[in-house]
């Protein structure tokens, strides 16, 4: 770009119709380049990229304004007097100096435009060019933020969205309750309660029995007790959920069989027909027992009779 400005400055005198525009504005371009380079040394890489983009936009804009004046540097009208042309050039130089002082990064673009050469007709387009250059940093800032957000992996409002997702996942009522997880949570809560009590004892041990009590220590102990109360409530809720989700409590002694104690018999459920049949069975059993008793008596009497008959036969023979 610097060589291009030098070539355009050197071509200024050769063109007919006024040769003072290009060479006079060339030092301004050089000053703009030096001023912009000195300021870029103290800037971050992002600001330097923005300045380079703005300079590239400023350069072509000024290059397009050169063809306005035929036969000479851009903006010099052929029918104007030399004094009027010199006044226009001085006005342009003053405006360029004013633009270079407040806008540090615009010096590169202005220097390039001066190197190419701008005439009196380029004052209004130069102001129009200044407005998009001022709007460029405002447009680049959201673009850089959009580029940084995907790299970081956190969209705008990402923290709030993750917290909402956690709250929804914790408050999901359709999720199955796992007794093992509840038991583990209850165990951690009990350990937390024990650690809180240790902190309470340590804080109470550090308090000295003086007439003036410190409000900070009292507030600290009260905060500990409030936290312990909440932890006990949590343990109670976990205990109720475990009992509701688990099976009924059975003592260990009832599950261990002992040899000395008789095994309990499980009575089946009895219906009416079964009861009737069972009653008939009992009656038949009683009847059979009675018949057996009677048969036994008959057998005993028959045996006695046989013994008596045998005795009588033996006595007759003798």
Swiss-Prot record:
One of its GO terms (molecular function) is transcription coregulator activity. Its main location: nucleus. It holds the Pfam family Med30. Residues 1-13, 34-55, 78-92, 124-142 have a biased composition (Low complexity). GO terms for biological process: positive regulation of DNA-templated transcription; regulation of transcription by RNA polymerase II. InterPro entries: Mediator_Med30_met. Residues 14-33 have a biased composition (Gly residues). It comes from the Eukaryota. Residues 1-92, 120-142 are annotated as: Disordered. It is found in: Nucleus. Keywords: Activator, Nucleus, Transcription, Transcription regulation. GO terms for cellular component: mediator complex; nucleus. Belongs to the Mediator complex subunit 30 family. Component of the Mediator complex, which includes at least CDK8, MED4, MED6, MED11, MED14, MED17, MED18, MED20, MED21, MED22, MED27, MED28, MED30 and MED31. Component of the Mediator complex, a coactivator involved in the regulated transcription of nearly all RNA polymerase II-dependent genes. Mediator functions as a bridge to convey information from gene-specific regulatory proteins to the basal RNA polymerase II transcription machinery. Mediator is recruited to promoters by direct interactions with regulatory proteins and serves as a scaffold for the assembly of a functional preinitiation complex with RNA polymerase II and the general transcription factors. This is Mediator of RNA polymerase II transcription subunit 30.
């Amino acid at each position: 770009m610097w060589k291009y400005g030098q070539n355009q400055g050197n071509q200024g005198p050769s063109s007919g119709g006024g040769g003072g525009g290009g060479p006079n504005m060339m030092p301004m371009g050089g000053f703009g380049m030096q001023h912009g380079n000195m300021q870029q040394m103290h800037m971050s890489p992002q600001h330097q990229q923005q300045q380079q983009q703005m300079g590239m936009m400023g350069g072509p804009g000024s290059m397009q304004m050169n063809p306005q004046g035929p036969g000479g540097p851009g903006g010099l009208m052929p029918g104007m007097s030399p004094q009027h042309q010199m006044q226009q050039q001085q006005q342009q130089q003053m405006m360029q100096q004013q633009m270079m002082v407040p806008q540090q990064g615009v010096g590169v673009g202005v220097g390039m435009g001066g190197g190419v050469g701008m005439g009196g007709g380029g004052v209004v387009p130069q102001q129009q060019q200044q407005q998009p250059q001022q709007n460029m940093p405002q447009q680049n800032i959201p673009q850089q933020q959009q580029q940084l957000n995907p790299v970081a992996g956190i969209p705008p409002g990402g923290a709030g969205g993750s917290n909402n997702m956690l709250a929804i996942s914790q408050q999901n009522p359709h999720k199955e309750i796992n007794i093992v997880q509840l038991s583990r949570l209850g165990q951690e809560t009990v350990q937390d309660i024990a650690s809180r009590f240790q902190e309470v004892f340590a804080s109470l041990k550090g308090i000295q029995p003086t007439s003036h009590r410190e409000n900070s220590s009292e507030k600290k102990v009260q905060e500990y007790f409030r936290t312990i109360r909440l932890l006990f409530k949590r343990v109670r809720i976990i205990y109720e959920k475990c009992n509701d989700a688990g099976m009924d409590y059975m003592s260990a002694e009832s599950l261990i069989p002992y040899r000395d104690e008789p095994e309990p018999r499980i009575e089946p459920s009895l219906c009416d027909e079964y009861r009737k049949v069972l009653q008939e069975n009992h009656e038949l059993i009683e009847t059979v027992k009675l018949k057996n008793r009677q048969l036994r008596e008959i057998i005993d009497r028959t045996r006695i009779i046989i013994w008596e008959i045998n005795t009588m036969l033996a006595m007759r023979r003798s």
